[in-house]
Amino acid sequence: MAQKRGTRLGCNDCNEINYITRKNAKKNPEKLSLNKYCSRCRGTTVHKEVKRK
């Protein structure tokens, strides 16, 4: 079987994709939103789930 693709988290301020994580889409259908460190902004910002192209 094919592996699951990771969920990408992008910074809300600068739109840079900094993190890749996994989530259970059946249990958590809404978009993931976490406070994470952004190296471009040099601080903690909200990172939201970004749609794959």
Swiss-Prot record:
Entry's transmembrane regions: none
Any one biological process term the GO annotation gives: translation
Keyword Ribonucleoprotein: yes
InterPro entries tied to this protein: Ribosomal_bL33, Ribosomal_bL33_CS, Ribosomal_bL33_sf, Ribosomal_zn-bd
Key words of the record: Ribonucleoprotein, Ribosomal protein
Molecular function GO terms recorded: structural constituent of ribosome
GO cellular component, one term: ribonucleoprotein complex
Family: Belongs to the bacterial ribosomal protein bL33 family.
Protein name listed in UniProt: Large ribosomal subunit protein bL33A
Organism: Mycoplasmoides gallisepticum (strain R(low / passage 15 / clone 2)) (Mycoplasma gallisepticum)
Gene it is expressed from: rpmG1
